[in-house]
UniProtKB/Swiss-Prot annotation:
NCBIfam families, per database record: infA
Record domain S1-like: where: 1-72
CDD domains: S1_IF1 (cd04451)
Pfam families assigned: eIF-1a
Family named by the database record: Belongs to the IF-1 family.
Full protein name: Translation initiation factor IF-1, chloroplastic
Assembly and binders: Component of the 30S ribosomal translation pre-initiation complex which assembles on the 30S ribosome in the order IF-2 and IF-3, IF-1 and N-formylmethionyl-tRNA(fMet); mRNA recruitment can occur at any time during PIC assembly.
Length: 78
């Protein structure tokens, strides 16, 4: 059986929920319920509301996804 293709999308974290779940507003305006990928969890990457993230989603259920990358934000010192 072939592995399914995942859909990559970008958005902004709008809400932090219990058990490392997040609500993300995608660039197209959709709301997605997401969790953190294992590699990000293992490397202690912290995600806060307002962060820009990359989300992977299955083509079968576009309302749920996995956060795979947090984009760097420009700090005031740069």
């Amino acid at each position: 059986m072939k592995k399914q293709k995942l859909i990559d999308m970008e958005g902004v974290v709008t809400e932090s929920l219990p058990n490392t779940m997040f609500r993300v507003c995608l660039d197209n305006g959709c709301q997605v319920l997401t969790h953190v990928s294992g590699r990000m969890r293992r490397n202690y990457i912290r995600i806060l509301p307002g962060d820009r993230v990359k989300v992977e989603s299955s083509p079968y259920d576009l309302t749920k996804g996995r956060i795979t990358y947090r984009f760097h934000t420009k700090s005031s010192n740069d």
